Amino acid sequence: MKKILIPMLALGGALAMQPALAQDGEALFKSKPCAACHSVDTKMVGPALKEVAAKNAGVEGAADTLALHIKNGSQGVWGPIPMPPNPVTEEEAKILAEWVLSLK
């Protein structure tokens, strides 16, 4: 029993130390500057997040590409106004990308 319990406790502790993984995508979206230019349903400075999800539905590698755009910024994807780099970690960018792509 001890041989199983100790690794399980260690794994639980390691996961607890990664707050970005525990955060919900929507809460992360609201805590970062994303909402200054984007909303879920309505185009603002940037596209509505549901538009982004629809455009990328079924596209292989979309989550990775979107995560890179979120972290590093992009230009010319949705119009002439560039998206600046965002103060997010790679993990947070991935969480945000997966959340955006899950929107219907």
Curated annotation (Swiss-Prot):
Domain of life per record: Bacteria
Gene3D superfamilies linked to this entry: Cytochrome c-like domain (1.10.760.10)
An example Gene Ontology molecular-function term: heme binding
Signal peptide interval: 1-22
UniProt subcellular location: Periplasm
InterPro entries linked to this entry: Cyt_c-like_dom, Cyt_c-like_dom_sf, Cyt_c_ID
Keywords: Electron transport, Heme, Iron, Metal-binding, Periplasm, Signal, Transport
Documented effect of changing V40I: In strain: 221
Main location: periplasm
Gene Ontology annotations for the cellular component aspect, listed alphabetically: periplasmic space
SUPFAM superfamilies membership: Cytochrome c
Post-translational modification: Binds 1 heme c group covalently per subunit.
Pfam families, A to Z: Cytochrom_C
Positions of transmembrane segments: none
Keyword Signal: yes
Job of this protein: Electron donor for cytochrome cd1 in nitrite and nitrate respiration.
Protein name: Cytochrome c-551
Organism: Stutzerimonas stutzeri (Pseudomonas stutzeri)
The encoding gene: nirM
